[in-house]
Amino acid sequence: MVRLLTMLLISMVVSGYYFPFSFSVLPQLNTKMALAMLGIALVAYQGFQKHRITFSRDLLGAIVFAFIFSFICFVAADYNHTDDYSYVTYFVSFFTWLGGAYVVCYVIRAFHGKATLNLLIAYSAFVCVSQCILAILIDRFSAFRALVDTYISQGQEFFQEVGRLYGIGAALDPAGVRFSIVLLLIVYLLCEDEGVKQVRWKTFACLFAFFVIAVIGNMISRTTSVGLFLGIVYLICSTGIFRLVIKGRYIRLYSILGGMLIVFTM
């Protein structure tokens, strides 16, 4: 039970990072910013303990790129005499996302002993499915919607005005883009990870998450259809079904997929 509650807490951290939102009492501070500040504090604390802060070569390259991009945008804005400096502060947004990501990886590693792509995909898929379910609950039950709208500030007045589904921090195109990314990652697991392909319940869980996100995610944001299309293309190209030949290691995947399609279409 404790393990399950801990995993649920980690999922809430992932959701707060991937689908940031604000509380009504602090509308200017969203969960991503809060996680970023916590991430900076963690980096400083660990650096103090180890007497040094290290960066990987890839991360250092990304940081340099962020500063170069911001500098180019500053020069462009100054040269064109424009007052729009939105992209000049891109490096601030970069470090905000980076700090939040550090916290996500930290809590996953603290509980599981490691932070791998598979674990990140699993938590992200669970969060996306949860957001889809929350969106349906908010839409169908006015009492639940009132509860969410009372304590969560996410511009829900506009969502209600245009008649769109929304979760907690998940709405419109930003949600669609993130749903699309997770759909592609789920297909990656189904096609490339032997540990998923050879275990029936893992294959079923991934396919179930894919279906839920594809269907309800499209109701939240039609941008999700981009991830659905690319995911199907990835699946077809990786498994070789377009050659009308199914490789042995994909038989389990297609048998479960076929069964789920029959159930969902009945």
Q: Which residue ranges define each predicted feature?
A:
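Membrane-interfacial loop-to-transmembrane alpha-helix junctions, especially the N-terminal start
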Residues: 1-9, 51-66, 116-123, 200-205
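N-terminal signal-anchor transmembrane segment
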Residues: 1-49, 71-77
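Juxtamembrane membrane-water interface segments that cap and precede transmembrane helices
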Residues: 15-24, 154-170
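Membrane-embedded alpha-helical segments of multi-pass membrane proteins
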Residues: 28-46, 91-100, 176-184, 226-233
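Structural signal for the C-terminal ends of transmembrane alpha-helices
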Residues: 40-53, 103-114, 187-196, 233-245
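Aromatic-anchored transmembrane helix interface
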Residues: 61-68, 82-106, 119-123, 128
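Alpha-helical transmembrane segments of multi-pass inner-membrane proteins
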Residues: 118-149, 169-220, 224-241
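A membrane-periplasm/extracellular boundary helix in multi-pass inner-membrane enzymes
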Residues: 139, 236-266
